[in-house]
């Protein structure tokens, strides 16, 4: 899935659209996407000027965004239909290595449960095949 199609599933835009490409998607099961980390991104101005590191909260947000795409594709809905997914919670978040400019962040999400519009995903972010972050992410589907 290319960026123009991603924009059909996510309401986010620059500088907060954190998914560059979807590599694989199995509706109702799994998604894998990528975020290319570049020094030109605004967060690196202050995090940190002489030692740029991708903020952990943005890694979590990127994982939540791919999870949201999976939810939308699974249900056959899009933001244009008047729906969105809100980040509702995180559990078991672990950061294992810093993510720096030049890295390609692979984002993976697997559906654990879906009960009445509350979705639970098992998520991972990887760089060069190594897990840099893992989390359980909850999203809430809402009609706008």
From Swiss-Prot:
Pfam family, one: FabA
Cellular localization per UniProt: Cytoplasm
MF terms (GO), sorted A to Z: (3R)-hydroxyacyl-[acyl-carrier-protein] dehydratase activity
Main location: cytoplasm
EC number: 4.2.1.59
Keyword Lipid metabolism: yes
Entries under InterPro entries matching the protein: FabA_FabZ, FabZ, HotDog_dom_sf
Keyword Protein biosynthesis: no
Gene Ontology terms: cellular component: cytoplasm; membrane
Recorded catalytic activity of this chain's protein: a (3R)-hydroxyacyl-[ACP] = a (2E)-enoyl-[ACP] + H2O
An annotated GO BP: lipid A biosynthetic process
Catalytic residue positions: 47
Keywords annotated in UniProt: Cytoplasm, Lipid A biosynthesis, Lipid biosynthesis, Lipid metabolism, Lyase
HAMAP family: FabZ
Biological function: Involved in unsaturated fatty acids biosynthesis. Catalyzes the dehydration of short chain beta-hydroxyacyl-ACPs and long chain saturated and unsaturated beta-hydroxyacyl-ACPs.
Family annotation (PANTHER family): 3-HYDROXYACYL-[ACYL-CARRIER-PROTEIN] DEHYDRATASE
Family affiliation: Belongs to the thioester dehydratase family. FabZ subfamily.
Name the record gives this protein: 3-hydroxyacyl-[acyl-carrier-protein] dehydratase FabZ
Organism: Hahella chejuensis (strain KCTC 2396)
């Amino acid at each position: 899935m290319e960026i123009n199609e991603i924009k059909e599933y996510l309401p986010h835009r620059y500088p907060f659209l954190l998914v560059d490409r979807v590599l694989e998607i199995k509706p109702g099961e799994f998604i894998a996407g990528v975020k290319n980390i570049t020094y030109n991104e605004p967060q690196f101005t202050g995090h940190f000027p002489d030692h740029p590191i991708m903020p952990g909260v943005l890694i979590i947000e990127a994982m939540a965004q791919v999870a949201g795409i999976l939810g939308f594709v699974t249900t056959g809905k899009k933001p244009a239909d008047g729906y969105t997914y809100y980040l509702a919670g995180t559990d078991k978040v672990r950061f294992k290595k810093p993510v720096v400019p030049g890295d390609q962040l692979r984002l993976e999400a697997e559906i654990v449960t879906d009960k009445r519009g509350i979705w639970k995903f098992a998520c991972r972010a990887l760089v060069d095949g190594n897990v840099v972050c893992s989390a359980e992410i909850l999203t809430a589907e809402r009609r706008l």
